[in-house]
């Protein structure tokens, strides 16, 4: 997968029949390719008013939610108010702007239909402020505070609800990812800096 990804976190456990009904709903807008890969057919059914977007396949993989880190799980549960039971993983095979939009529209539609929240799998991808180099901020922390302040300000301006979830990286440093409601992600879709986390 070379494109962006996200996950819709749901409070309820899904049985095989829930999964089957979900695939029936998906088939109203998408065409099943192979396995859990789907192609966009009718974007307007996802609330996307566009003609002939250029998108690649999208992985749509519902399953049980699991966490490998108890501290991260506890932070998530405190922040969102429930322990996710089901996760619908969404991942684009390609990385064009329409793939980012396809992913976001599908995440919003899924979260609204099933009462979920959207794990962006990273912080909202707002570009760093002028004078801050992304690589320096990520690798050495130089400018990271200013960048995160800009991200938080953008989140506040978008409306909706959002939570920052801290986690420990492989390098032993603390990073964050955002979990947002569908209204916030829908507002982010209209922002000039819109893109999803890759």
Where in this protein do the model-derived segments appear?
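Acidic, proline/glycine-rich low-complexity IDRs
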Residues: 1, 105-198
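Short, flexible beta-strand-to-coil junctions
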Residues: 1, 11-14, 43, 91-100, ...
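Short, extreme N-terminal segment that most often corresponds to the first beta-strand
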Residues: 1-48, 192-198
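Ordered hydrophobic segments in well-structured contexts
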Residues: 4-10, 87-91, 105, 117-119
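Well-ordered, non-membrane alpha-helical segments in soluble/globular domains
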Residues: 18-23, 99-105
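Short, intrinsically disordered low-complexity segments
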Residues: 20, 27-98
